[in-house]
Amino acid sequence: MDVNSNVDNPVIGLRSFGENPEAVSEKGIAYARGLENTGILSVSKHFPGHGDTSEDSHETLPVVRHNRARLDSVELLPFKRYIYDGFGGIMTGHLYVQLWIKVISRLLSPRR
């Protein structure tokens, strides 16, 4: 369910259903439905989205620097639709999402 929005991405490339979040959602869900109709559990990956990274996550930890609006409208959209359509298998990616680390740090801070 990765939206391939970075042409320099060394990992995703042709492993994505495209550059458009809507099209990736539709094709990914159709593929998942086809798998599950034959008794195979579908697993969507790489949550929360590995399509706009420039590093190979098998070699280093890519950093996702997008704000919440961008994450919601591009990277997370296919995963949201996948879950909404009743699918549940999701594999996380090896990614450092800056925004989430900031939020988690604030939530865990004793100075809240």
Regions found by a protein language model. Give the residues of each.
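A generic short-segment signal for beta-strand/edge and adjacent turn/coil regions
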Residues: V11-G13, E59-T60
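Active-site-proximal loop motif in hydrolases
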Residues: S16
